[in-house]
Amino acid sequence: QARPRPGPKIPP
């Protein structure tokens, strides 16, 4: 399974 890149999820 391809995991999303780690990082803070900041809504636009």
UniProtKB/Swiss-Prot annotation:
Task: Keywords in alphabetical order, please.
Answer: Hypotensive agent, Metalloenzyme inhibitor, Metalloprotease inhibitor, Protease inhibitor, Pyrrolidone carboxylic acid, Secreted, Toxin
Report the locations given in the UniProt record: Secreted
Question: According to its record, what are the GO cellular component terms?
Answer: extracellular region
Q: Please provide, alphabetically and separated by semicolons, the GO molecular function terms listed in this UniProt record.
A: peptidase inhibitor activity; toxin activity
Q: Which GO terms describe its biological process?
A: regulation of blood pressure
Asked whether the keyword Secreted is assigned, the reply is: yes
Would the keyword Lyase be found if you checked this record's keyword annotation? no
The free-text tissue note of the record is:
Expressed by the venom gland.
Q: Which residues carry this modification: Pyrrolidone carboxylic acid?
A: 1
Q: Tell me, what does this protein do in biology?
A: This peptide both inhibits the activity of the angiotensin-converting enzyme (ACE) and enhances the action of bradykinin by inhibiting the peptidases that inactivate it. It acts as an indirect hypotensive agent.
So what family is this one in? Belongs to the bradykinin-potentiating peptide family.
Q: What is the name attached to this protein's record?
A: Bradykinin-potentiating peptide 12e
Organism name: Bothrops cotiara (Cotiara)
